[in-house]
Each structure stands twice: as structure tokens, then as C-alpha cells.
Amino acid sequence: MQAVRCHGPHELKVEDIEGPGMAPGAGEVSVRIERGGICGSDLHYYHDGGFGTVRIKEPLTLGHEVSGVVAAVGAGVKRVAAGDRVAVNPSRACGTCRYCQRGEQVHCLDMRFFGSAMRFPHVQGAFSEQVLVDEAQCFKVLGSLTAGEAAMAEPLAVCLHAVNQAGPLVGAKVLVTGSGPIGVLCAAAARRAGATEIVATDVAPLPLKTMERIGADAVIDIAAQPDALKGFSQDKGTFDVVFEASGREAALVGALDAIRPGGRIVQVGIGGDMKLPMTQIVAKEISIRGTFRFHEEFGTAVDMMNKGLIDVSPRISQTLPFRQALAAFDLASDRSTAMKVQLAFS
């Protein structure tokens, strides 16, 4: 079978691989992949060969935002059957370490996450024609939900976890800085959680247009209007919660004037270390929380999409055949023309 593999910076190839035996063992499921979304981490591997201190040391099959059809199931599998459409959770916690035992699987000491070079040998990803996964990683897709929409379960789960980190949002005024796929989904999840006012910022027009489509109350092009947030800084600030989805120090620092005393900042984007004005943070009693991946939120994401509670379709901008992966990755790298680019495997 064929897969999309990264060998190093700008060394992306569609090539034949020897996958594990596709006859599933006990508790395993073989899934024929239909759609796969290109994530920011995939782009880091493509452009830089990794991120931070993590570097590709062997060919790495990319991809962790995928959906497909069950090809076969192993002995004892009950939650899915051959022919079922599924979203595949890329996260496989060990279940036995102290964090898993405390219900904090996101911090698992032996985590295996699709398409990751954080451990060696690397954990291969799901941008391949077929994958073998544990039964617990499969979530049924129902009704008219498309394969592309089902593949958005992973980024939606990331944002649902971020919303859980934010605390109560009923009646909240929310600022989202960075309106890429994650920022847009954070806005949608915040609205579903009860936020009554959502303002979004970005430096590119396309993401802001998508924010408008999903119902943001106001959008601000910070590149064109660098002082536009100052209007929200009166009386010590306006927003109850900030979702910082850009990973940019300037975005986080700029939000501090606009957040009210006692407000909560959830740092979603990862862009490296930042220098923060601690005096302002202390004086305004601002809480800053990190958010990383997800666990139970993946099942919630699929359930919400199955029930039509969140429409992820506006975030999908282009779909290309997986054999055109190089063109797809270049397209996904251009924020002026693309939001979420997906690969079609069927």
C-alpha cells in the first residue's frame, strides 16, 4: 500500500510501504482511510523536519486527522463492524501509568500518537491507504456526515478540551486570537458552551472571513488595524476569556489589555517560549492555562458532529488526491488561500 511520508525538511514522498499485517488481531480494527486533514504539526515536519528539539530520525508517515471505513475486525471487537464509517482517534494512551490511572490520559507516560517523532522508533501516522488500530480508537460516523467532516473530529476535540480548560462560558465575552482552523473551532465550541459575544483577530483576510461565516460577532484584521483592540481595554478590559490560538507572543501580550481583571487566558497555539508582562498579569489577577490535545473529548466531538450540533464544513477549504500530497502541503502552507486542506485516499 502507499503512504505519505516525510524523510526530512521538504522531503515529502508518496511511496509504497510494508504496513503491519492488515489482518487484525484480537481487539484490533483494520480501517481503510478515506480522508486526512493536514495539521500544523504535519507542516512543521514538512518544512523544518520537526519542531523544538523533536526531529525526524527515520521516514515518518504523517497524518493524525483521519476518517475511513472499517475493512475488518479482530476477535472480540464489538463497538464496530466491517463496513462501518469511523473517525479514528490518533491518541493511544497506555492506560496503566499514574496519569492514566488518575484519568489524565493526555499526560500518559507511554503515549502513542499518530505521526509523531517524539519517540524512537517513531509512531507512524495515518496518511496511508489502510491502518491498523485498537478498537477503542474507532468512533462510528452516522447519517449524512461526510468523510471530510468526520476527519475534523481530531481538531474539534482539541478545541473542546481547550473550552473545558476555560471553565464556565455561559454568558461570557470571548476573544479568539488567531483564526486558523483551531481558532475557528475554538470559537464554535465556545459558542456552543454558551459564550454570548465572540471577537476574533488574525493578520490574514481568509481566516477572518471563515470566522464571519461561523457567526463571530466581530472580526479584526490586526495587520490592517493594529490598534483595534484598544477599544476593548476601557475600564480595565472587556473579555472574560481569551483563547490564544496563534502561538504568537504579540497576540498574547496584546490581549492582556483587553481582558478584564480576573479573566482567563487559555493558551492553545504553540509557537515557542514567550516573555510575558508579569506585573500586568499579577495586578489584573489573570489566570493563564495551557491546553494540550484531548482524551474523552474525541468521542464528544464525533457525537456533536453526528447530531449536527457543530458544523465543521466551513473550515474545509480544499481536498486533493493523496498522490498530490506535495501540492496539498504547499497549498496548506499558504494561509492566504487555504484553511484546512485534506487528502482524499478513496
Identify the function of each model-found stretch.
Residues 1-3, 253-256, 295, 299-346:
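C-terminal hydrophobic helical "lid"/dimerization subdomain
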Residues 264-266, 276-315:
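Rossmann-fold dehydrogenase core element
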Residues 259-260:
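Helix-to-beta-strand junctions that scaffold the AdoMet/dcAdoMet cofactor pocket
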Residues 20-36, 50-101, 142-144:
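Glycine-rich beta-strand-centered segment in the early N-terminal region that forms part
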Residues 158, 182, 190:
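Hydrophobic/small residue at the entry helix of a nucleotide-binding pocket
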Residues 176-179, 191-254:
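Adenosine-nucleotide cofactor-binding segment
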Residues 1-65, 129, 219, 346:
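Short N-terminal strand-loop motif that marks the start
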Residues 94-177:
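NAD(P)H dinucleotide-binding glycine-rich loop of Rossmann-like/cofactor-binding domains
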